[in-house]
Design a protein with these regions (language model features):
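Flexible "cap/lid" subdomain of the alpha/beta-hydrolase fold that forms the substrate-access gate
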Residues: 2-80, 88, 93-101, 112, ...
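ATP/NTP phosphate-donor binding region
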Residues: 83
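Glycine-rich NAD(P)-binding loop of the Rossmann-fold in SDR/ketoreductase-type enzymes
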Residues: 109
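A short, exposed helix-loop element centered on a Lys and neighboring polar residues
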Residues: 115
């Protein structure tokens, strides 16, 4: 009788939640169609401007450009995840006994975006720049389900477990050996890597010593902010485009990946620091993997799983956190920063870099390296 009464009382709440999910899904579907039309018109403009031959021709890069696959920036290695057996590629530099600094890239990049930090911090830390699954030289399992958010988070957890320092046995009262204590790592994420880093640090704070986030929103903040700010909805229009099948792959490939090039190199979307603008070879370091047959689909599947019902951690990471943000970020509204600051612990640090865009590790490599070195080198570890 009591169970029936409880079920009856909860029925309106269940109905409201079901309606809310339906409305949210309809909203995403409408936004995806609208974005598809808008970007489709851009594709038509490219066709009229360049003609069919140049528009529908894209070059598969046969050889990696200098720096991508050689040892210029560090040693190339692979690891196998314990559960899935998936092989992930990473580049490492620094003393093997130094603290582990794990770097997670975003879209549409790969480990190469961390090349400056590998050089600048590789003398004091064991720096590891990972290729996330589906990117670069890491394996690219087929199917959208292989890129669910919970799968990606588990990848990072296992990478920390494999590459991090081994547990040490502590000494308890009276000199007795205590339980193993996990030695932690420094976790740094940009863009998609930052989104993953937020949630790994929240769900596994015992594995992370300090957290650094660069131009990456927390899911708990982003949804509400986007609903209240039309400007962010427009800046994020590509996210809705990526919900569609095949069309994003086609549009991103047009005119030898013109849209990707524009995002990385244009004066208003790309790197703001003129001294750090990407060369043709540096752009090819990203296009090399994306241009391979099927190379665009795995990164886009990250976005296609973004609106699934994956639980969002509501509590901010308990560990020391540094939030770095480019003041001229073209993809993320600057008003997001105070919203993110409010969801962090009072001890968290925030640094807004004037004149910097979204691609912070390449836009301002020297200031970013100094800020990281100072933050990681201070002694404010959590207890």
């Amino acid at each position: 009788m009591l169970l029936s009464l409880c079920s009856l009382l909860l029925a309106p709440t269940r109905l409201l939640l079901a309606l809310w999910r339906l409305v949210a899904r309809l909203g995403v579907a409408v936004a995806a169609v609208a974005a598809g039309v808008a970007y489709g018109l851009w594709g038509l403009w490219v066709l009229l401007r360049r003609g069919p031959r140049r528009t529908f021709r894209w070059r598969v890069r046969d050889q990696p450009p200098p720096g991508l696959a050689d040892g210029t920036f560090g040693e190339h290695r692979y690891l196998h995840l314990k559960d899935s057996g998936l092989r992930l590629h990473y580049v490492t530099r620094g003393p093997p006994t130094a603290p582990l600094l794990l770097l997670l890239h975003g879209f549409p990049q790969n480990w190469f975006c961390w090349r400056h930090l590998l050089q600048d911090l590789g003398t004091r830390y064991r720096v590891v720049a990972l290729d996330l699954r589906g990117y670069g030289a890491s394996e690219k399992p087929p199917g959208r389900d292989s890129y669910r958010l919970e799968v990606l988070l588990e990848d990072i957890r296992q990478v920390i477990e494999i590459l991090g320092p081994p547990p040490v046995v502590g000494e308890g009262p009276g000199g007795h050996r205590g339980p193993p204590r996990l030695l932690q790592v420094y976790l740094v994420g940009h863009d998609w890597g930052g989104l993953l880093a937020w949630e790994v640090a929240s769900s596994h704070p015992e594995m992370v010593e300090k957290l650094v986030i660069m131009d990456a929103p927390h899911r708990a903040v982003m949804a509400g902010f986007m609903a209240c700010h039309l400007s962010q909805l427009l800046r994020s229009s590509y996210i809705f485009l990526f919900q569609l099948p095949w069309l994003p792959e086609l549009l991103l490939s047009l005119a030898d990946f013109e849209l990707v090039r524009t995002a990385l190199t244009s004066s208003w979307l790309g790197i703001q620091n003129a001294a750090q603008r990407l060369t043709e070879q540096e752009v090819d370091a990203y296009l090399y993997g994306l241009s391979q047959p099927g190379g665009l689909t795995p990164p886009l599947n990250y976005y296609r799983n973004l609106f699934r019902d994956t639980p969002i951690p509501r509590e901010p990471p308990p560990l020391p956190t540094l939030l770095l943000w480019g003041a001229e970020d073209a993809f993320l509204d600057a008003r997001l920063v105070p919203c993110l600051r409010r969801c962090l612990r009072p001890t968290a640090r925030l640094c807004l870099l004037p004149g910097a865009g979204h691609w912070l590790p390449e836009d301002q490599p020297r200031p970013v390296a100094r800020l990281l070195d100072h933050f990681l080198g201070t002694g404010d570890h959590h207890h």
